[in-house]
Structure formats: C-alpha cells, structure tokens
Regions:
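RecA-like P-loop NTPase motor core
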Residues: 1-77
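Hydrophobic, Leu/Ile/Phe/Ala-enriched alpha-helical segments that form helix-helix packing faces
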Residues: 34-35, 80-83, 172, 176
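Polar/charged alpha-helical tracts
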Residues: 36-37, 53, 81, 114, ...
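Sequence-level detector for tyrosine residue identity
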Residues: 3-6, 28, 38, 52-54, ...
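Activity-critical C-terminal alpha-helical subdomain
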Residues: 66-145
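Generic alpha-helical structural element
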Residues: 19-23, 40-44, 86, 90, ...
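Charge-biased C-terminal accessory regions appended to nucleic-acid-, cytoskeletal NTPase
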Residues: 120-178
C-alpha cells in the first residue's frame, strides 16, 4: 500500500492536538486550513531533516507527523524510534500529498485509477527522479485548465471545498481530526 501509519499496532484512531508537515507547500497549506477549522495548530518542519529536532523540542504534545513516504528515507529511522517510545506521537506517511489527492477519487479518471493500481507500469525512472515527482506531474497534468488546477507551491482554494476536502481526508484511515 502507498501509505503507512506508525505505530502500526494502533487499533484506536489517532487524535492529534497538532499536525507537523515536512514542508510548506500545498500539502502543508491543506492541513493548515483543516487544523484551523478544528482549532488545532499545524506547523511545518521546513524540510524532512528538521522533523526529528522539532519532535525532540515538543515532547509533551500529541503530534501527528505527516510526511511523504516517498521522500522521507534516511531521516525515518530516528523519527520512528521516537514514535516507538512516545505514546503521544504518530506518523502518517502517504506516498505524497499529490498521491493522496489522486487516490481520493475526486478526479474520476479511469487512467488515474489504473496508474494507482500499478504505478511501476507507468513510471519511467529515467524521466522522474521519484514517485513523488511523478504523482505531482500526473496531478498537474490531469487538473490543468480545470477548477482543480494544481500547483505544488500554492494550494488552489478548490481543494478546501467540503466535497473535495472530505474525499482527501477520507483517505486517511485511523486519523481523527476533531
């Protein structure tokens, strides 16, 4: 599957008091808007290499870290060790924010559904450095000229409309934002 949640043993829903994203692009802007609706704080670590130190500095808060599974890599181990030892931490790793949007079904596009089933059949690793870049290119291409026109740097307000927003949040099983 293209997302993972830690601690993976968790049977209860994760109810964070705060969300931390790794960067300040569209994904952060999306979760920041969601957090505001629920009177929660959303912070950005301004880069995956800062996630660990942020968590060390905020040790008493219930934090959900949302980071791109595709790009998290080596930083992951240190953060995972923290998550294993602290009950107030959870880690949600979708492949990327763009993957989350694509898999939400809001685009109702059969080609996207096929690609999400077996992405490795479609991704040319010579052309795309990472899955994240591929999914970003796909989302950008599929939404160009539509009301959901996507750019990585700035979130289109259309993604915060109830139907769209709820479809995206609906992908995040076990995460409860109240």
């Amino acid at each position: 599957s293209f997302y993972r949640i830690y601690p993976d043993s968790t049977t209860e829903n994760i109810k964070p008091e705060k969300i931390l994203t790794e960067d300040s692009n569209s994904g952060y802007q999306f979760f920041d808007a969601i957090c505001k609706e629920h009177q929660m704080q959303c912070d950005t670590a301004n880069g995956k290499s800062n996630v660990f130190s942020y968590l060390k500095a905020h040790r008493n808060e219930k934090i959900l870290v949302i980071a791109d599974g595709a790009a998290f890599g080596p930083e992951m181990d240190r953060v995972l060790q923290l998550v294993q030892t602290r009950e107030n931490l959870a880690l949600y790793l979708p492949e990327s924010f763009e993957w989350l949007v694509l898999s939400s079904g809001i685009l109702k596009d059969t080609e996207i559904a096929q690609i999400l089933q077996t992405p490795s059949d479609y991704i040319d690793s010579k052309e795309y450095f990472s899955w994240e870049r591929y999914f970003t290119a796909l989302l950008t291409e599929k939404t160009a000229g539509t009301y959901l026109n996507y750019t990585k740097k700035t979130l289109n307000e259309a993604y915060l409309r109830d139907g769209v927003k709820n479809a995206i949040l609906g992908q995040m099983q076990k995460v409860e934002l109240k």
